[in-house]
Swiss-Prot record:
One of its GO terms (molecular function) is growth hormone activity. The lineage of its organism: Eukaryota, Metazoa, Chordata, Craniata, Vertebrata. Its main location: secreted. Residues 1-17 form the signal peptide. GO terms for biological process: animal organ development; growth hormone receptor signaling pathway; positive regulation of growth; positive regulation of receptor signaling pathway via JAK-STAT; response to nutrient levels. This is Somatotropin.
Amino acid sequence: MNRVILLLSVMCVGVSSQPITENQRLFSIAVGRVQYLHLVAKKLFSEFENSQLEDQHPLNKIFLQDFCHSDYFLSPIDKHETQRSSVLKLLSISYRLIECWEFSSRFLVAGFAERAQVTSKLSELKTGLMKLIEANQDGAGGFSESSVIQLTPYGNYYQSVGVDESFRLNYELFACFKKDMHKVETYLTVAKCRLSPEANCTL
C-alpha cells in the first residue's frame, strides 16, 4: 500500500510540475492585464455616473439604444458563438479592440497618471496579443497590423436629453471602454482555456 501511495505521489508531482509553455505564459499575462483594464473601466464608468446631475440620469437608458463603433467589428454575437470561434479569431478581434483604445484612451476624463497607465497597459497588451497571434497562426495566413481604427463620436442620440456635447462624448467613451474590455476579457479567457483540453470552457 505504501508503495502505491508513493507511486501516486510521484505521478501527481510529475503532472503538477509540467513546464508552462511560452504560449500559456503569454496568455496568463494577457488575461491578467485585460482583467486590470476591465476593473479600471468599471471604476471610471461608475465614478462618472455618480457625478451626473439628476437631469442627466435619463442618459443611461438612452445609451442602451446606441452602439459602440466596435459593435461593427465582425465578432461573436453571443456566448455560444464565442465558444465556437477559433483561438486565432478571438485573438484577432481582441487585438483590434485593444488597438482602437490605445489611441482613444488618451481622451478619457481621468487623472493624468491613471490615464497614462491605462494607455501604457493597452500598449503592452497589444504587443502581447500580437505575439500570441503569431504563435497561434499555424499556417492560417498572415495578420496585418496596418489597419488602425480610431474611435470617433457615436452620433447624436443624446441631443434630446439636453446634455452638452462634451458630457455626451465622455459618457460614450466610458461606457464603450467598459463594454469592450469586458469583451476582450471574455475572448481571452475562452482562448486561454482552449490550451487545457480537460478544462470546461463554458461561459
